[in-house]
């Protein structure tokens, strides 16, 4: 397995995996992806097999605003991670997360946070397997006023 930061030439591999994680409109993804790869406080990684098949992606950021459950700032934040089902439980997600931890230290981060939907038990289990622990549960509300 080979893990590398994403460049412009790898947008199609990233897009394919990103659409599996967040099934949305490709044109919206592409526009956002092109912006993300230019931002120093964002990290995008792809994992490839020895035969150059893209099998996993990770997106992370450095957040300077308050992050639920953390005590410091800045905080590394796992924005999204996806491993093709047939490659799960083989250490790929661990390898991706370790790369973020190394990168985040350049920004003086001492905490690494993430979130998951309350009902996404698969994500909860993955986070725990990667060394994260639950800090709090939050339900967001909104009210239209105009």
From Swiss-Prot:
Entries under SUPFAM superfamilies matching the protein: Acyl-CoA N-acyltransferases (Nat)
Key words, A-Z: Acyltransferase, Antibiotic resistance, Plasmid, Transferase
Catalytic activity: kanamycin B + acetyl-CoA = N(6')-acetylkanamycin B + CoA + H(+)
The keyword Transferase belongs to this UniProt entry's keyword annotation: yes
Molecular function GO terms recorded: aminoglycoside 6'-N-acetyltransferase activity
Residues annotated to bind substrate: 22, 25, 66, 79, 115, 136
EC number: 2.3.1.82
Gene3D superfamilies linked: 3.40.630.30
The protein's name: Aminoglycoside N(6')-acetyltransferase type 1
Organism per entry: Acinetobacter baumannii
């Amino acid at each position: 397995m080979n893990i590398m930061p994403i460049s412009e030439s790898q947008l199609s591999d990233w897009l394919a995996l990103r659409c599996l994680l967040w099934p949305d409109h490709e044109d919206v993804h592409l526009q956002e992806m092109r912006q993300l790869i230019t931002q120093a406080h964002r990290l995008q990684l792809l994992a490839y097999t020895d035969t150059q098949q893209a099998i996993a992606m990770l997106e992370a950021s450095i957040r300077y605003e308050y992050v639920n459950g953390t005590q410091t700032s800045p905080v590394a934040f796992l924005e999204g991670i996806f491993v093709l089902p047939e490659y799960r439980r083989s250490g790929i997600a661990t390898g991706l997360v370790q790369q973020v931890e190394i990168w985040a230290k350049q920004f003086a981060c001492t905490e690494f946070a993430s979130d998951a939907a309350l009902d996404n038990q698969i994500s909860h289990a993955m986070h725990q397997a990667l060394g994260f622990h639950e800090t709090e549960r939050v339900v967001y509300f909104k009210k239209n006023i105009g």
